[in-house]
Amino acid sequence: MNDQVWLTLAKKINELLKRPDIDGIVITHGTDTMEETAYFLNLTVKSNKPVVLVGAMRPSTALSADGPLNLYNAVVTAAAKESKDKGVLVAMNGLILGAQSTVKMNTVDVQTFQAPNSGALGYVLNGKVFYNQVTLKKHTTQSVFDVTHLNALPKVGIVYSYSNIEADMVTPMLNNGYKGIIHAGVGNGNIHQNIFPVLTDARQKGILVVRSSRVPTGPTLSLIHI
């Protein structure tokens, strides 16, 4: 998966959803980067019609393959009128998850996709869709992002912090065309003293630096500024 595939996919989805004979779209996707694709589409699809991503954790030859039911549930979700205006969705193992909160939590478990910060939006049971909540986050038609005329995306890198991180892990990003750096810090997005000067240099060079956390739940508070 890469930016070019994402841009092509978003543009094609927007084109298809303009047709009155199409009520929703289901996208089969590998589970490794499904959450990334879902979130990208959640910000770039310009329709209130359902877009549902689905995959499988087990191969089709497994004794209890999860793919067939996941696909069925995804189609049911995309076809349900209740799924409109809920943003891009992920349908896995009976749950319906909002793209903005979907996280892959386990390497092999069929219940790997969860929403630890907000919970699932709903579920599918016996071919029927049930919603318990909606997201208040801006998405799709409310999003400020428009990729209609874009052929490439800015180059952004991720710095994963740890106890002994050194500045040379970050320095190459300052001179190789990066427009942004995401810092996955410890705790509340805290920045190691060894790389703080380099990230400060990045800001002075016009590179955007965004603090986040490697911790899976909870917000990252604005305690420091670079």
Language model region names:
Residues 37-69, 76-79, 204-213:
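Short, acidic/small-residue loops that bind anionic groups at enzyme active sites
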Residues 98-183, 188:
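Accessory alpha-helical/coil subdomains and C-terminal extensions
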Residues 224-226:
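Conserved small/polar residues in nucleotide/adenosyl-binding loops
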Residues 27-49, 191-200:
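Short Gly/Thr/Asp-enriched flexible loops that form oxyanion-binding sites at enzyme active sites
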Residues 1-16, 197:
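ATP/NTP phosphate-donor binding region
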